[in-house]
């Protein structure tokens, strides 16, 4: 039996675990200090009462002969998919119900989606960014190219025509910098992806924090994005229940046709 050799290429520890240890050590040494936590994107308030009630109602329903229904639909309950449809429609973006896939969270989807793509693909990852993007691809053995960002470009990397990537990660607003792309900037990425037959994995976990009308809250607000992008979303941030585990991914029908063409 052979083990996956690429696991040896992972860093010895996870970034957020390191941060937690450093914070704990500092707090022990300085108990009088109030710490503003800028590590993992956790929440600081309890679950909203409406969320707790919905969980209670669902559990109570499953405890009755009439309400018990075992495994749910493999792609998510229609009532939730329809609610997500309405959420997008309220911002002017139309989705079909069968383009929405409910899951146990964005982090799982970000990893599981890679099963669709060959390990020979080259991955473009902004730096700094959510470390899971890198770890998921390191363990698969894909080549990773970093798009360096800094104050000089507002921590927003832009396409480089000299670089050929097959899978492009975009997180907007970005974790950890908070930088968010304008529609014009996202259009440049969409154009690059279509030109290079690339796929954009668009992490929209923090879209609910956008209030500036010049900034897109969904990649699908951009013309042509439905042909080259997958959008991953998390209820941990919009509904404030980190650890409860629920999210969804949007895969437009136009992308399905594009993937058939590429393959």
Which role does the model predict for each range below?
Residues 172, 200-201:
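Residue-level marker for buried hydrophobic side chains located in beta-strands
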Residues 66-191, 207-222, 226, 230:
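Conserved core of the PLP fold type I
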Residues 222-263:
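Conserved core segment of the aminotransferase class I/II
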Residues 2-104, 112:
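N-terminal small-domain helix-loop-helix segment of the aminotransferase-like
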Residues 204:
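Walker B catalytic acidic pair
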Residues 30, 140, 195-196:
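Helix C-cap/helix->beta junction micro-motif
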């Amino acid at each position: 039996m052979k083990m996956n050799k690429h696991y040896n290429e992972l860093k010895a520890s996870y970034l957020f675990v390191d941060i937690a240890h450093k914070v704990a050590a500092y707090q022990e040494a300085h108990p009088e200090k109030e710490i503003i936590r800028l590590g993992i994107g956790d929440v600081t308030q309890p679950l909203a009462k409406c969320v707790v009630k919905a969980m209670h109602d669902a559990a109570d329903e499953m405890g009755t002969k009439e309400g018990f229904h075992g495994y749910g639909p493999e792609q998510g309950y229609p009532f939730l998919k329809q609610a997500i449809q309405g959420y997008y429609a309220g911002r002017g973006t139309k989705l079909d119900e069968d383009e929405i896939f409910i899951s146990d969270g964005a982090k799982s989807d970000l990893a599981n989606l890679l099963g669709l793509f060959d390990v020979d693909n080259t991955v473009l990852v902004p730096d700094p960014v959510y470390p899971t993007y890198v770890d998921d691809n390191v363990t698969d053995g894909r080549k990773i190219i970093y798009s360096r960002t800094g104050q000089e470009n507002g921590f927003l990397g832009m396409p480089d025509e000299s670089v050929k990537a097959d899978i492009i990660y975009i997180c907007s607003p970005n974790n950890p910098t908070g930088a968010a792309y304008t529609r014009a900037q996202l259009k440049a990425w969409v154009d690059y992806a279509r030109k290079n037959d690339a796929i954009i994995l668009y992490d929209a976990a923090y879209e609910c924090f956008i209030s500036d009308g010049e900034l897109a809250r969904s990649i699908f607000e951009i013309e042509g994005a439905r042909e080259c992008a997958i959008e991953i979303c998390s209820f941990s941030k919009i509904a404030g229940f980190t650890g409860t585990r629920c999210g969804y991914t949007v895969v437009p029908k136009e992308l399905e046709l594009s993937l058939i063409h590429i393959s």
